[in-house]
From Swiss-Prot:
Function: Sulfur carrier protein involved in sulfur trafficking in the cell. Part of a sulfur-relay system required for 2-thiolation during synthesis of 2-thiouridine of the modified wobble base 5-methylaminomethyl-2-thiouridine (mnm(5)s(2)U) in tRNA. Interacts with IscS and stimulates its cysteine desulfurase activity. Accepts an activated sulfur from IscS, which is then transferred to TusD, and thus determines the direction of sulfur flow from IscS to 2-thiouridine formation. Also appears to be involved in sulfur transfer for the biosynthesis of molybdopterin.
Natural source organism: Serratia proteamaculans (strain 568)
Keywords from the UniProt entry: Cytoplasm, tRNA processing
GO biological-process terms attached to the record: tRNA wobble position uridine thiolation
Protein name as annotated: Sulfur carrier protein TusA
Active-site feature positions: 19
Keyword Kinase (UniProt): no
Annotated NCBIfam families: PRK00299.1 (NF001423)
Chief site of localization: cytoplasm
Location relative to the cell: Cytoplasm
Assembly description: Interacts with IscS.
Family of the protein in this entry: Belongs to the sulfur carrier protein TusA family.
């Protein structure tokens, strides 16, 4: 089985940051990425379980995978739909 998270083009460590900082950092990072590139986000703020999927829907990015059973949480975002 392939670990999708290991194949990310970029990684964003948001450990220790609290809302709204993780989403602000994701937005800033994604802005400098090319369409189709992937970003691994690692966070421990429980609010990211709601905020990251919401950000992806609102900004029309694809949430490829997420692991949110226990912290640290991992999200794999692909820029663009």
């Amino acid at each position: 089985m392939t670990d999708l998270f290991a194949q990310a083009d970029q990684t964003l460590d948001a450990l220790g940051l609290r809302c709204p900082e993780p989403v602000m950092m994701v937005r800033k990072t994604v802005r400098h990425m090319d369409n189709g590139e992937t970003l691994l986000i690692i966070a421990d703020d429980p609010a990211t379980t709601r905020d990251i999927p919401g950000f992806c829907r609102f900004m029309e990015h694809t949430l490829v995978a997420q692991e949110t059973d226990t912290a640290p949480y991992r999200y794999l975002l692909r820029k663009g739909v």
